[in-house]
Structure formats: structure tokens, C-alpha cells
Amino acid sequence: MESPLGSDLARLVRIWRALIDHRLKPLELTQTHWVTLHNIHQLPPDQSQIQLAKAIGIEQPSLVRTLDQLEDKGLISRQTCASDRRAKRIKLTEKAEPLIAEMEEVIHKTRGEILAGISSEEIELLIKLVAKLEHNIMELHSHD
């Protein structure tokens, strides 16, 4: 019988995020909010909403709702792009900086605890294998 690898990977991502979600509860961030803030922080400055949606792997309308909420909380700002008035550039605000620092610390610490007992060579191999799987899936999508 074949291993349900896809289901295993989906479950792993779900429980990994659930653990971080639980640990970030004191910061009053939903999973959607912290995933979005984390991606904004990780990407180069002044990303567009389109680039951010691609990085997170969600549709733009879903992202817009989240960005509206983060903007209402004063954590991000959006400016119209000078070269394309339809595009919006996203920036973290000063108010977001201490929250991002605390959030990133929790994420980094949790990642370290999750990967405890796994060698750096094993982690590198896993990263390469996941990249190959992603490449294969993207190739299949391009042919369909």
C-alpha cells in the first residue's frame, strides 16, 4: 500500500500552523493575520498585493479582506503604485514592528523545537525533496 504522502504533508502543515497559532494567541492574531504579516515581513519591501497573494498561495479577494483588517488595526499601509495605479504596495507600519519581532521570535523558537533531533543534512534533504515535489506539481499544472 502506498503512503498517503500528500495527506501526511497537509496534516503536518496544519498541525505546525496550529501550534504557532496557539502560541501567538496572546498577541491576538488570527492565523490568517500572522501568516500574512509573516509573509510581508519576509518578502522584499513594497510588495504588491498580487505578489503577496502568490507568496501566501491565496486568491487576491481573500487577501484584500485580510489586508483591510490589518490596515484597520494600524499594522500595514497600502499605497497606490506610481507605475500602475491599479496596483497597491504594502508596507508594515511602525506600530507593527514590535508585534512582528515578537511574532517572528515565537515562529523561530517553535521551528527550532519542531526540528529538534533532526540533523541539518536531513533538513536540507527534506527541503530539496519538497522543492522537487513542488516542481513536479507545477509542471503537471502547466500541461493541464
From Swiss-Prot:
GO biological process, one term: response to stress
Record keyword DNA-binding present: yes
Keywords: Activator, DNA-binding, Repressor, Transcription, Transcription regulation, Virulence
UniProt keyword Cell cycle, yes or no: no
DNA-binding region ranges: 49-72
Single GO term (MF): DNA binding
UniProt-listed Gene3D superfamilies: Winged helix-like DNA-binding domain superfamily/Winged helix DNA-binding domain (1.10.10.10)
Start and end residues of each HTH marR-type domain: 2-135
Function: Transcription regulator that can specifically activate or repress expression of target genes. Required to activate expression of virulent genes.
Quaternary assembly: Homodimer.
Family: Belongs to the SlyA family.
Name of the protein this chain belongs to: Transcriptional regulator SlyA
Organism for this UniProt entry: Salmonella choleraesuis (strain SC-B67)
